[in-house]
Amino acid sequence: MKKNSHFKYIGIDPGKSGGITLINGKDIKTYKCPQRTEDMAILFSLLIGDTSSYDVKLLMERVWARPNNAVRSAFAYGVNYGQWMGIIACHEVPLQTCLPNQWISYYNCDKKLEYQERKRWLKEKAKSLYPNLNITLTTADSVLIADYAMKEHFKNEE
């Protein structure tokens, strides 16, 4: 892995049962998404600290309502996504998004896996990359999104 200079890489899985992960050199922190908007904002502020917004490389999974989602579930998902967007904008951090298949395919996850199997596979992949980090099904996606951001998505911006 090449040297990643001074950037802080943040990956966000924006669902209510998602997470946020920061990779800053060898320092890696991952958190379950807080339930309250105020707590989301506080956590984000703590993660970026006094870092210039130009030194934060943030990648959030792009979400949308799917036909098989219940209306209430899709609305809650969209609200959380919008809250993250607002918090990020208030900190003037440039936001980039990626589709789930972009970052998932980077890790060569079998596309034929059922949802729960895929979630477990991604958790194990995250654990193999960061064995000293306490990774759960809730935080695994954000860990991999941050890792993908650092190794692939922003590789030409260093």
Give names to the regions the model predicted:
Residues 1-158:
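Phosphate- and other anionic-substrate recognition elements at nucleic-acid/protein interfaces
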